[in-house]
Amino acid sequence: MAPIPGSGLAKGLAVTLRTMTKKTVTAQYPDAQPELPPRSRGVIGLFEENCTVCMLCARECPDWCIYIDSHKETVPPAAPGGRERSRNVLDRFAIDFSLCMYCGICIEVCPFDALFWSPEFEYAETDIHELTHERDKLREWMWTVPAPPALDPAAEEPKEIAAARKTAEKLAAAQAAAAQTDAAQAEAAQAEAAAEAGSAAEGAPDAAPKPQEGEA
């Protein structure tokens, strides 16, 4: 049987009429902010204090959108008799988000936890050059990085936390030992000063010497 002319249009209008009577489900962005899933990839934040300028992130980036400049400085020895050493100092760290494809390789390969994902995605610009975020802007994104999920109570303690705790305990023990040594030295100095004062008092001549025999 040949289809009735206009039946397809009628079916389409029927679907439209049924949909018009239902409640809308469209999220009116930006009036209603979306609920992002965990581990959303929005923008990359830089924790500059952890960066050692190893250049690993820039070398592994497939888009070559990470720009790093640095210089070397000489650090004096930490202890007397030690040797000076040189270290890299970060001058520039920038990411061009107009080239970035958000693969996350730079975050994965960073051995010092200096790069993190932030769920923030509202950084559109009218000028493409503004999408190159320098280290000050990347630091601002760092404060929008969500806290890591809580550890499972039955899980083993991470080795980084265990190492940090051991280091803190050693430092506290060294400080306590140094304080005890200082206190003992202070007590010894006080005792020595008191002994010297007593010896000086015993050896001092009397204020009124006795007259010798034959003197009036």
Swiss-Prot record:
Name any cofactors this protein relies on. Answer: [4Fe-4S] cluster
Q: Where is the composition biased (Low complexity)?
A: 172-209
Taken from the UniProt entry, a GO cellular component term is: plasma membrane
Subcellular location, record wording: Cell membrane
What does the record say about how the cofactor binds? Binds 2 [4Fe-4S] clusters per subunit.
Q: Which residues bind [4Fe-4S] cluster 1?
A: C51, C54, C57, C110
Domain of life of the source: Bacteria
SUPFAM superfamilies found in the cross-reference section: 4Fe-4S ferredoxins
- Self-association state and partner proteins as the record states: NDH-1 is composed of 14 different subunits. Subunits NuoA, H, J, K, L, M, N constitute the membrane sector of the complex.
Name under which the protein is recorded? NADH-quinone oxidoreductase subunit I 2
